[in-house]
Swiss-Prot record:
TM region positions: none
Protein name: Small ribosomal subunit protein uS11
Keywords: Ribonucleoprotein, Ribosomal protein, RNA-binding, rRNA-binding
Similarity remark: Belongs to the universal ribosomal protein uS11 family.
Length: 134
């Protein structure tokens, strides 16, 4: 039987260092079921992120514009702690939270430089799934 007490070395916990980034990118992925907002530095390293589910919405409420607004506010506040002031917005997907997420980024104090739609569209690539009959 092993002796009581510590078996191994204690795990070292490293605190996240505070990045000081003034300009970055905000990637908003808005699907029919959820909205994910990632704020990165210009090279693509994620500084902060939030989603409608991460903020506390469940089920069909994740797909609402209000949930997208709350997710964008949460991500923007965390990015501002790292010194973020200006973002270029890249929007992807057909969801309902696209415009409200951009508006809430502006409302939290981030300056929006440009807005680009980067939704992937196939040039008749893969065959889509069969139609739903409800």
């Amino acid at each position: 039987m092993p002796p009581k007490g510590r078996q191994g070395a204690a795990k070292k916990v490293r605190r996240k260092e505070k990045k000081n980034v003034a300009h970055g990118h905000a990637h908003i992925k808005s699907t029919f079921n959820n909205t994910i907002v990632s704020i990165t530095d210009p090279t693509g390293n994620v500084i902060s992120w939030a989603s409608a589910g991460h903020v506390g919405f469940k089920g069909s409420r994740k797909s609402t514009p209000f949930a997208a607004q709350m997710a964008a506010e949460s991500a923007a506040r965390r990015a501002q702690e790292h010194g973020m002031r200006k973002v270029d917005v890249f929007v992807k997907g057909p969801g309902s939270g696209r415009e409200t997420a951009i508006r809430s980024l502006q409302a939290t104090g981030l300056e929006v430089g440009s807005i680009q739609d980067v939704t992937p569209t196939p040039h008749n690539g893969c065959r889509p799934p069969k139609r739903r009959r409800v």
